[in-house]
Amino acid sequence: MKTITEFQNKKVLILGLAKSGEAAARLLARLGAIVTVNDSKPFEENPAAQALLEEGIRVICGSHPLELLDEDFYCMVKNPGIRYDNPMVVCALDKAISILTEVELAYLVSEAPIIGITGSNGKTTTTTMIADVLNAGNQSALLAGNIGFPASEVAQAATAKDILVMELSSFQLLGTEQFQPHIAVITNLVPTHLDYHGSFEDYIAAKWRIQHRMTDKDYLVLNADQELVKSLAQKTKASPVFFSTKEKVDGAYLADGYLYFKEEQVMSAAELGLPGRHNIENALATIAVAKLRGISNQVISKTLSHFSGVKHRLQLVGTLNQVTFYNDSKSTNILACQKALSGFDNSRVILIAGGLDRGNEFDELVPDLVGLKKMILLGESAERMKRAADKAGVSYLDAKDVAAATKIAFEQAKPGDIILLSPANASWDMYPSFESRGDEFLAAYDALKGEA
């Protein structure tokens, strides 16, 4: 960890705990800051706040009192989930208290170079793929960021011999000023989190912060299959490297069933351990990063052929009575569902879908639904999805929850069929997270297995 004195004896406010706030509080205390943590959860229900108090860090819980900002704070470290129109954030900015992100804090202390991955879909899979390939090539890659390991915590332990492979959400990137990864990846961009950002343009602007400080000595890996993303190459100082499943590009690409990097054949697409065209995209982005890091084709091919996926992201769960189950609970939007379906023969697929109603009519999903064996629909958006199913000529059944849907799907299935949970909707109408939704699918599979 770099020794920096910027925060020594300075009063710093941590707004919102969760994993990243807790990690930031400990790091700033270690750097000599006078830390105050403010979290809305009551103290008696807040084990993280209790632990920090025991470590000598001041904690204020239960509300966000504006008068707290009357203290002379040097800066505020904001939880990524707290919006910039939050009264505490607005008041802090009015008082000229600078807002720092936890990701920026990690960058300031990290001795290790950073590879940053962002985008609307595919971030976690691509981040994990990259780390696996680098580690297989004897480069010490450490996962960090939105993938579940607070960046500021990982950065403290990292040395100059390590590499931080960091998944970055738009929430984390918004507000970064000094953050400068050596390699950055943008997997794709579709309208997401508009309730947070307000518009697609503002969402793109948040994602674009990833390259804000990059120079021509840094590399920006871009999806050339999306004209929007491809065009960003004209707007960066970084050196662009492309990936594409449709055309030969200056970077990684798919041609005649093989994955290439700059005319050098790396591996066959058929060797990839995960189905779906979107996973070819993820693999190509990984290949681009791996080749920039000097990893051999043999290591890349071997690692990607054995890569079995990430939990809740087109995760192969198992096979029961020759029926195969896939858990793609992370499919919280239409594009994710489209990409999941692209990996299968629709005539064998029973799709479990539905969730939080955000007003989508799902018309753009209709062509991808054509030919499905059946759909099992649930959640607030079920009626809208039924209209899409009708347009696609697909029959459907209702289910009260994922567990019931899984059982119904299995009753409808024949040997050789695929039961795919890919909701195309957020989970919050029925479940606290996509993880809990996916866990119910896994538990339902285990229950069916126990009955078999």
From Swiss-Prot:
GO annotation, biological process: cell division; cell wall organization; peptidoglycan biosynthetic process; regulation of cell shape
UniProt cross-references to SUPFAM superfamilies, sorted A to Z: MurCD N-terminal domain, MurD-like peptide ligases, catalytic domain, MurD-like peptide ligases, peptide-binding domain
Subcellular location(s) of the protein: Cytoplasm
Cellular-component GO terms for this entry: cytoplasm
Entry superkingdom: Bacteria
Binding locations of ATP: 119-125
Keywords: ATP-binding, Cell cycle, Cell division, Cell shape, Cell wall biogenesis/degradation, Cytoplasm, Ligase, Nucleotide-binding, Peptidoglycan synthesis
Pfam annotation, one family: Mur_ligase_C
Catalytic activity: UDP-N-acetyl-alpha-D-muramoyl-L-alanine + D-glutamate + ATP = UDP-N-acetyl-alpha-D-muramoyl-L-alanyl-D-glutamate + ADP + phosphate + H(+)
Nucleotide-binding listed as a keyword: yes
InterPro entries: Mur-like_cat_sf, Mur_ligase_C, Mur_ligase_C_dom_sf, Mur_ligase_cen, MurD
Pathway(s) of this molecule: Cell wall biogenesis; peptidoglycan biosynthesis
GO molecular function: ATP binding; UDP-N-acetylmuramoylalanine-D-glutamate ligase activity
EC number(s) per entry: 6.3.2.9
Record-linked HAMAP family: MurD
Family affiliation: Belongs to the MurCDEF family.
Chain's role: Cell wall formation. Catalyzes the addition of glutamate to the nucleotide precursor UDP-N-acetylmuramoyl-L-alanine (UMA).
Protein name in the entry: UDP-N-acetylmuramoylalanine--D-glutamate ligase
